Design a protein with these regions (language model features):
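Sec-dependent bacterial lipoprotein signal peptides
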Residues: 1-21
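Bacterial lipoprotein signal-peptidase II cleavage site
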Residues: 23-33
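Extracellular mucin-like PTS domains
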Residues: 34-68
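Beta-lactamase-like hydrolase cores
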Residues: 66-102, 201, 205
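A short, well-structured edge-of-sheet supersecondary motif
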Residues: 84-116, 374-377, 383-385
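Short active-site loop at a secondary-structure junction
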Residues: 90-94, 110-168, 213-226, 294-297
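Short, surface-exposed loop or secondary-structure junction motifs
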Residues: 161-366
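Short, gly/Ser/Thr-rich active-site loops of penicillin-recognizing serine hydrolases
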Residues: 393-415
Length: 415
């Protein structure tokens, strides 16, 4: 069968997979969990001060003294038994967790089973906050006005003259989202690793075949879908750079990331529907090179990579001495835009730009189809990234067991 035909034939499986994730079905249990190995890293700052006395004719100068503040100490020992029991009960191949704190950096980094610091995992929708950040960076640089029509940037934007980039990255464009039909015909290019991002976005934005299904922007929350392809294409036009180059320039180089990149994996990898494609096995070379990465769900990372991005969000947009995002852009990403713009909510959750906003506890998250759960507690100044290679219900179930444990460990910091 020709490769293109095989890719298209995979779309019904993709549709079933995405619907299952939305419904929160339980993951099936497999065999026994592999042997557990853990790596734990604690990082805390040192404060150095110098005091020098005055030299007199009757006494020698006192030596310079250095006072080192006690290192911050966190107790995360409650986490491992919970995770070990969970992966054994679900038959998982392991898990990874990194916790970062605004002042202390990486305060916990642990892996179980087959996972380790170098393991690269597909993260599905946990890609969205990464994408939103690229557009906000271009906004910071004056290359893109996220509140102006797409048509101001891209010639093909005239197809939907009222839609802005801010609409796209808040799932508020009025274009057809993932549901109820993830394999929506007019937008099928978003899941194919053939063609280009520009070509796909132009097709999505100009096709007349969706006319009966689209609505005005900022009138209804429609999660996911090809609006994210359009967002990436707008970023390419505004910057004059490819998506891969933008990822490298904005995130990889300043933040020292090891693996972050995008592809379009959904129709390339064989595996059981509804679950992580085990055939990827931490190896991006299993994917064909593509000029049409899937932006809403096509990234892959290590735990350390995602932790660095979370820390950047906590440290006012800085990676080391390099500014990645402005404070103003971060505030917009983290705020509940859909409630502010048109009074929408989704079962008690709001949505910013790439982030779900829990309207009850203020926690923001960007969970993925395959079991990744990143979260930030902006008020208390910490964040965490949890990864299992399973499905969304499984990742969310484990995260639910860890939210309070992580919070208590951070709150109990000493030193």
């Amino acid at each position: 069968m020709p490769r293109t035909a095989r890719l298209v034939a995979s779309l019904p499986i993709l549709a079933a997979l995405l619907v299952q994730a939305a419904c929160g079905g339980d993951a099936s249990s497999g065999g026994q969990a592999s042997g557990t190995t853990t790596t734990t890293v604690g990082v805390a700052p040192e404060t150095t001060t110098s005091t020098t006395s005055t030299t007199t004719t009757t006494a020698p100068a006192e030596p310079t003294t250095t006072t080192v503040a006690p290192a911050a100490v966190y107790d995360f020992t409650a986490i491992s038994p919970i995770v070990q029991a969970f992966i054994a009960s679900k038959g998982l191949n392991g898990a990874g967790l990194i916790v970062v704190q605004r002042d202390d950096g990486v305060v916990h980094h642990e892996h179980w089973g087959e996972f380790g610091p170098e393991r690269i995992s597909l993260i599905a929708s946990s890609s969205k906050m990464v994408v939103a950040g690229i557009l906000m960076r271009l906004h910071d640089d004056g290359l893109l006005d996220v509140d102006a029509p797409v048509a101001d940037v891209a010639a093909w934007g005239a197809g939907n003259p009222e839609i802005t980039p801010a609409h796209l990255i808040s799932n508020s464009s009025g274009l057809v989202g993932l549901f109820p039909n993830p394999a929506y015909g007019p937008y099928v290019c978003q899941f194919l690793p053939i063609g280009t991002l520009q070509g796909c976005a132009e097709k999505v934005f100009t096709t007349p075949d969706d006319d009966a299904d689209i609505i005005p922007p900022d009138t209804e929350f429609r999660y996911g879908g090809a609006q994210w392809q359009v967002a990436g294409a707008v970023a390419e036009v505004a910057s004059g750079k490819s998506w891969a180059d933008l990822i490298d320039e904005v995130y990889v180089q300043p933040c020292g990331l090891e693996a972050l990149a995008f592809n379009n994996p959904f129709t390339q990898l064989e595996g059981e529907p509804y679950r992580y494609p085990a055939s990827f096995n931490s190896d991006p070379s299993t994917l064909m090179a593509t000029d049409n990465p899937n932006l809403e769900g096509g990234a892959y990372v290590t735990t350390g990579d995602y932790g660095a991005l979370l820390l950047m969000h906590l440290q006012e947009g800085m990676c080391g001495d390099t500014r990645v995002l402005s404070v103003e852009s971060l505030e917009r990403m983290h705020s509940d835009r859909i409630m502010e713009a048109y009074g929408a909510d989704v079962g008690g959750s709001g949505y910013g730009m790439g982030w779900w906003v829990d309207q009850e506890n203020g926690r923001i998250t960007d969970g993925g189809l395959y079991g990744t759960v990143p979260w930030l507690d902006l008020e208390d100044g910490y964040g965490a990234y949890l990864v299992v290679e399973a499905d969304s219900p499984t990742g969310n179930a484990l995260a639910g067991l860890l939210y309070d444990v992580v919070e208590e460990a951070v709150a109990g910091r000493t030193g």
